[in-house]
């Protein structure tokens, strides 16, 4: 399972998840991707379960890229412990996900859209957030819509 080799601080505050992903929201390596539709935490175990589901389905057909990394420690107190006496110990690691973030990418010569869609669907079931399957052509359509509407030229009337 994924976790950082070493961190500067062992414990973090939980934080807030506001806004949309400004980084990691475009397809960079493959042709197909799984994009987050809502915010949440994804644990290293959930990432590994999704990766295994996709890998088993595509077998040796293509390549899978994991675009998220669990770098936030979540602490827990032991069961039936009284209040006080400090913060608990780190129990597991999570990746903080915002809407629009690309979670997984898939590509290769033998990967068709149908195979990629089914593999991503199997991965979706392992995740606690809503996700959407996108391809490179879908991304280009979205990127093209960001252009400002053409402004009519101003002519000087005399």
Curated annotation (Swiss-Prot):
Entry's Gene Ontology cellular component terms? ribonucleoprotein complex; ribosome
Q: Name one GO molecular function term.
A: tRNA binding
Q: Which GO terms describe its biological process?
A: translation
Q: Supply the PANTHER family for this chain.
A: 50S/60S RIBOSOMAL PROTEIN L16, LARGE RIBOSOMAL SUBUNIT PROTEIN UL16M
Q: Which family does it belong to?
A: Belongs to the universal ribosomal protein uL16 family.
Summarizing the function annotation, the protein's role is: Binds 23S rRNA and is also seen to make contacts with the A and possibly P site tRNAs.
Q: What is this protein called?
A: Large ribosomal subunit protein uL16
Q: What is the species of this protein?
A: Prochlorococcus marinus (strain MIT 9303)
Encoding gene per record:
rplP
